[in-house]
Structure formats: C-alpha cells, structure tokens
C-alpha cells in the first residue's frame, strides 16, 4: 500500500518536459559509425586510473616541494576530467565526440570552483599564486601605464591606419567570425558589436585603454574587423544550413577517399539548427531574455579587460588568451542551451552548461570588484546607469527593426526551430485558412518551388528523430 501511495505516474507534460530538457542537456548519439568509440569503457578507465596513480606515487622524485604541488594540481585536473567523461552530461553537441563536451563542462566546473576559492584569498595571496605560476609576472606592467590612447585623432594617414592592423585586429576578426557561428543572426551580432563600442565609451573612465579615436572605433573596429568577421561567420552558417548531415557509416563507405572525407566531417556539427532569435510574434519575455543575453555577453567581455588590468598581465600572456579560448569553448553549448530555453515553450529550465557559464560571468565580476576596490571606487554611477539604459534602448531598437524587416521583407522558409508551436511557415499558415483551390486564399505559385526542398528537410529531420530542432545524432 505504501509503495502504491509513494509511486506516481508521470503525466504527458512531465514526459515532454524531461524529453526536451534531455535533448539540450544530454544529447544522445544514434548515428554511430565506429562502435569502439561509443562503447562504455568504465573498467578500462578504472584500471588505468589505479595503475597510473600507483606509478606516480611510488616512482617519481618528490624532493622538490614546488614540483610536488604543481604535479599534484595537474593530476587532480586530469582525473577530474576522467570523472567528467564518466558522469557529466553530454550537453547539446555530440561532434566530434560527446566525451569532448563532457570535458569542456568539467573544465568549466573546475574554473567555477577556482573562482570561488579566489574569493577567500586576499590580494597578496592571489599575486603570490600568479608569481608561482609565472615568475615573470613580477615585472609585468599595465598597458595603460606605457601606452597612449586616442592621441592626435585628427591626424589620419594611411600609414597610421595600416599600423593598427596588428595581431589584435586579426584577433577581432576571427573572434567575431566565431561569435557569428554561435549566434547565427546578423542583427544580434551587429547589435552586440555596436553596444560593445558604447560600453567602451561608458567605462573609459575606469580603463584608459578603452579610449580610441573615432575612426578607429567606427571604421577599423565596427566596419572592418567586426563586420568582416560577422560576414565570414554568417557565410559559413549559410553553407552549413544547406548541407545534408546524414552521412553514411564507415562500414557503408568502400573507398579510401570517402572514409577520409567522413573522418573529417566528424569534426562538423551533427545537425544544424536554423536559428530564429526574434519571431514577429515574440513576447515581452523573449525580448527581455535577449536583453539579459546582451548584458551577460557584455559583462563577460568587460571581465577580460578588468582581470588583466587589476591583476596586471599583458593581453599576450597565456592567462589572457587562454581564458579567452576557454570562454569561447564553453560559450558554444551555452548559447545553444540558452536559445533552446528562450524559444522552446516546453523547456522550463536552462541547461547545466548555461547555468555554470552564468555563474562564472558573475563570479569573475565579483572577483574584479573585490580585488579592484581602488579602481571601482572611481566609478561614476551615472555612467553605469546610462550604459544599462543605452544597451536596453539599442537592443530594443534593433529588435524592433529586425522584427519589422522579418514581417515585411524577410524570406521565411519552413524550418524546425526550437519551439514547434512557434515555428513560422507560409505553408502552415495557409493550411489554417479557409478556402478552396483556386480562390484568393490559395498559396502563391512560387511556394511549389520550395515543396521539394521542404519535403527533403522533413525527411532529413524525421530520420534523425529531430524534436524542436535538435537532432539526436
């Protein structure tokens, strides 16, 4: 009787909720090409762990204390990643292998715990830790102390413009190409690019290196570096959207060239979701969610500059570019999970990677404020308030423009987005109308040209058991 009372049959809504959350948090691999790489190897990993620990415990020289600490930390990270492969969720991606994304999530958890640890240290202890990692940091200087910014802006020559195309300019270009691959929206990418330049203006009183000449901000940053990177990323997006992602298994490929091509394609997405951040029928909650996305994105970018300014290390130091690469790695599944949460009405919670990313962003900001109190004591509250209002106005203005363009000029094709009940399609809207063939309510003639394309998309998605735009592959 007690067991009957304690048990509860899951409703249809509960089943759908669990299914939708699992698809963004624990994506399954169904199109397995080589069985060996997807079989459980828990006993093998257990044996490897025990043997390797015994080897390092009894064979290595432990006479150097600093070497012991360093190797111990590396071993903890290594074996924590092994546990990540065994226990952590896959996330929304399965290519090139789910184990890779489990380790990415494991690294984000480690970084989160490291930031929590930093909160309980004082500034001298943090600097001692940095000097232990790299003794050369004792002699590091701030870029703002040795360089001048926004000087002689009225002098515009080709030599001066070309001199600004350094390694950082190429970093801007490729960085925005990757951001476009993640966001997949011209409007949102351009909004983030413009609002970041506004962010630099409002925080220029705290970080002098944010001061730039107008032609540097508008022409070099926004139009050339950022704009070129956005264009390249969106071109790659269109290329991936046109591709068919149901490749044959290695067993079905009989030529060496075909097998090599299939191996290379393993490092491309298993499925490509047509991203639609803004629907013409978007609710206020959707707009507010995009605004929150903008704020967190700007905060993460600001943390990059505040960290290297407060703890004094150059932009070329591994602590700087290593963090940027790491944040870029965990941003990919984060954006995917946040997009699913924002657009799928049946997804009631964010994914675990998205949750950890949000905590990391705010923890980095807290660390900067705690150890940079001398810097933040100069903060002009009015500038911060104006920045928030300006970002909100720019975001809402851009959203309105994108929605207006989508309603009047946007080319809408049938897609399988995150939210099935919010998917817009001219064919679906026509079928809901009342009318007969040949009447005014009949579909336009050009709709038939896309019929084969839409049917191919339906067949392709049905084979991979796609639900809400996430292919189980």
UniProtKB/Swiss-Prot annotation:
Region (Disordered): 430-473
Major subcellular site: endoplasmic reticulum
Record keywords, A-Z: Acetylation, Disease variant, Dwarfism, Endoplasmic reticulum, Intellectual disability, Lipid biosynthesis, Lipid metabolism, Membrane, Phospholipid biosynthesis, Phospholipid metabolism, Phosphoprotein, Transferase, Transmembrane, Transmembrane helix
Bias kind Basic residues: ranges: 455-464
Regulation of protein activity: Requires calcium ions. Inhibited by exogenous phosphatidylserine.
Gene Ontology cellular component annotations, sorted alphabetically: endoplasmic reticulum membrane; membrane
PTM-bearing positions, type Phosphoserine: 417, 425, 442, 454
MF-aspect GO terms: L-serine-phosphatidylcholine phosphatidyltransferase activity; L-serine-phosphatidylethanolamine phosphatidyltransferase activity; transferase activity
Keyword Methyltransferase: no
Pathway it works in: Phospholipid metabolism; phosphatidylserine biosynthesis
Subcellular location: Endoplasmic reticulum membrane
Catalyses which reaction(s): a 1,2-diacyl-sn-glycero-3-phosphoethanolamine + L-serine = a 1,2-diacyl-sn-glycero-3-phospho-L-serine + ethanolamine; a 1,2-diacyl-sn-glycero-3-phosphocholine + L-serine = a 1,2-diacyl-sn-glycero-3-phospho-L-serine + choline
Stored Pfam families: PSS
Topological domain spans for side Cytoplasmic: 2-35, 94-102, 208-216, 308-319, 377-383
Known outcome of mutating residue 265 to P: In LMHD; does not affect protein levels; increases the rate of phosphatidylserine synthesis; profoundly impairs negative feedback enzyme regulation by phosphatidylserine
Effect of residue 353 to R: In LMHD; does not affect protein levels; increases the rate of phosphatidylserine synthesis; profoundly impairs negative feedback enzyme regulation by phosphatidylserine
Enzyme Commission identifier(s): 2.7.8.29
Enzyme class, broadest EC rank: transferase
Entry similarity comment: Belongs to the phosphatidyl serine synthase family.
Name of the molecule in the record: Phosphatidylserine synthase 1
Organism of this sequence: Homo sapiens
Gene: PTDSS1
């Amino acid at each position: 009787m007690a067991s009957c009372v304690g048990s509860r049959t899951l409703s249809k809504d509960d089943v759908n909720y669990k299914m939708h959350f699992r698809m963004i948090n624990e994506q399954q691999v169904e199109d397995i090409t080589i069985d060996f790489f997807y079989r459980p190897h828990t006993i093998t990993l257990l044996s490897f762990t025990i043997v390797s620990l015994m080897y390092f415990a009894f064979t290595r020289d432990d006479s150097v204390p600093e070497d012991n600490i360093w190797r111990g930390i590396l071993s903890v990270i290594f074996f924590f990643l092994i546990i990540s492969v065994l226990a952590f969720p896959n996330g929304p991606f399965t290519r090139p292998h789910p184990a890779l994304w489990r380790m990415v999530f494991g690294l984000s958890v480690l970084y989160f715990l490291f930031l929590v640890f930093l909160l309980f240290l004082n500034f001298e202890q943090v600097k001692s830790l940095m000097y232990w990692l790299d003794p050369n940091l004792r002699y590091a200087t701030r870029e703002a102390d040795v360089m001048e910014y926004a000087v002689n802006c009225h002098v515009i020559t080709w030599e001066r413009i070309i001199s600004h195309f350094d390694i950082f300019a190429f970093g801007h270009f490729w960085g925005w190409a990757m951001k476009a691959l993640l966001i997949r929206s011209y409007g949102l990418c351009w909004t983030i690019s413009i609002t970041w330049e506004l962010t630099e203006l409002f925080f220029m009183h705290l970080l002098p290196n944010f001061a730039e000449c107008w032609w540097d901000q508008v022409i070099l940053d926004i139009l050339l570096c950022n704009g070129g990177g956005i264009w390249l990323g969106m071109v790659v997006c269109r290329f991936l959207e046109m591709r068919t992602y149901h490749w044959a298994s290695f067993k079905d490929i009989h030529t060496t060239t075909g097998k090599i091509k299939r191996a290379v394609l393993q490092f491309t997405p298993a499925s490509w979701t047509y991203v639609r951040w803004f629907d013409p029928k978007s609710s206020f909650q959707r707009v507010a969610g995009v605004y929150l996305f903008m704020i967190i994105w700007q905060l993460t970018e600001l943390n990059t500059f505040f960290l290297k300014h407060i703890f004094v290390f150059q932009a070329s130091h591994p602590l700087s570019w290593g963090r940027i690469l790491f944040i870029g790695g965990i941003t990919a599944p984060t954006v995917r999970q946040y997009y699913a949460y924002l657009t799928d009405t049946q997804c009631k919670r964010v994914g675990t990677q998205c949750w950890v990313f949000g905590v990391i962003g705010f923890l980095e900001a807290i660390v900067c404020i705690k150890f940079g109190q001398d810097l933040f004591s100069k903060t002009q509250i009015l500038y911060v308030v104006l920045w928030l209002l300006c970002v909100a106005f720019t975001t809402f203005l851009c959203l309105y423009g994108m929605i207006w363009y989508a309603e009047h000029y946007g080319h809408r094709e049938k897609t399988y987005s995150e939210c099935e009940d919010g998917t817009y399609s001219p064919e679906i809207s026509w079928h809901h109308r009342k009318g007969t063939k040949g009447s005014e309510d009949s579909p336009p003639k050009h709709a038939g040209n896309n019929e084969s394309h839409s049917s191919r998309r339906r067949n392709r998605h049905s084979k991979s058991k796609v639900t809400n735009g996430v292919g189980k592959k």
